[in-house]
Amino acid sequence: DWFKRLTRRSFSHSHNVSVSGGTNKFSYSASMGYNNSEGQEIGNDNERMTGRIALMLRPIEKLTISMTLNGSVSTTNGFFDDINPMGYATNTNRIIDPDAYYMQENGYYYKTGNKETLSYNFINERDNSGSKARSNFMSASLDVNWHVLDWLTYQFTGGYSTNNSTNESWATEHTYHIANLYRGYDFNSVTPTSADFKAAQLPFGGRLYTNDNNQYSYNIQNKLQFSKAFNPNNRLNALLGMELRSSTAKGTANTVWGYVPDRGERIVAPTIPSQVVSPGGSPTGWGILKELYDRSWKRTNNTNNFLSFFATFAYSFKNRYVVNANVRNDASNVFGQDINHRIDPTYSFGFSWRASEEAFFQKHLKWITTLNFRGTFGIQGNALTRESPELILSQNGVQAGYNRYYSTISQIPNPYLSWERTKNWNFGVDLELFHMFYMNLE
């Protein structure tokens, strides 16, 4: 029963503790949590710890300051790229002994001429490979709410967050994966003087892939809110604001060969290319070193900055007629050099008429309990972060045959890059009859 050998009953448990207290002038709350989850597949589990602290200060009647700090740490254990316990349990014949090794194709024979098959056992493959992901997250925020006047409020919101993750996956020298790609024979099955040993790129050690990512972001927002009723029939609401936000993502990915985790996590050097000789006597080329210098190492560094100004306006007369308007302008480091798009705001307008509140309806059409007409028109946009206002040149290594550094153009420039524009019209009617039947038309 492959499911019995490769899977289990999933089980998870969570624990949380929290404290809180305070007065009208000061309050606090703190919490901690722990979660452990064992997945359905043996070898797949997750552990997570979280924490949160929140403080509220009210030094004067009209001023409120709130601060929050969040954090979490998690670790996830999983499988190597080509290890799928559930798929193997579903598709594999039950006659096969789970502890036995059976023959698989030798993918390395084209370099050695040796077509002998390789030994394969799924449980051995699972136990001698794996993956692990670690993540650390922390965020802090500050909110200030100040009622300057009865009809005027100032709000400040600021936040900063960081998320660091480390991912690694590995396959040791005891796996079929390494034998099939880099060795051509089962581990420890040949002598150092044999032709197969001399033709192996990686006679000792396995492969380790690591990927480290660091993300940072901050957000600052200032808003002024205006809300005033001039008399029972007239009310005005308005808001002015600015927002500054930025996000940066940095990452480094790397692959090394010769990884031996059971000997102090050492790296054993692969065979020198000039010493890797096929049975025919000709070198096989750079071998693993070619992979090392050909896209196996990668670093990314990407930053997006945005500065925004926005305003909203809403006017209500007799609580029946409402008009509103919104305008927003954004600047970004991903835009081009076209001066016509440096100030290119988005905007929207809307209206609403509560017809059922009119005297005519109240007197002659009482069975129409609700009748609203509304409409909006607006332009919205998204930043095309995948495009670039500048020429992107990929500076590569040395071009074979020319023995010169070479570069390739990966993206042509778009100097007219700006927000994409989407126009929206919306009209709607809300109707209710006898306080029983309701209809909405958009």
Model-predicted segments: where are they?
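Surface-exposed loop/interface segments of Gram-negative outer-membrane beta-barrel transport/assembly proteins
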Residues: 1, 39-44, 50-139, 155-157, ...
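Residues embedded in well-ordered regular secondary structure
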Residues: 1-43, 80-82, 125-128, 145-147, ...
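Residues on the lipid-exposed face of transmembrane beta-strands in outer-membrane beta-barrel proteins
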Residues: 17-21, 53-57, 140-146, 220-228, ...
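One face of beta-strands
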Residues: 32, 158, 347-351
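Transmembrane beta-strand segments that form the barrel wall of outer-membrane beta-barrel proteins
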Residues: 32-38, 323-335, 375-377
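Long hydrophobic segments that form regular secondary structure
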Residues: 145-150, 420-442
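A short alpha/beta connector and helix-capping loop motif
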Residues: 343-351, 435-440
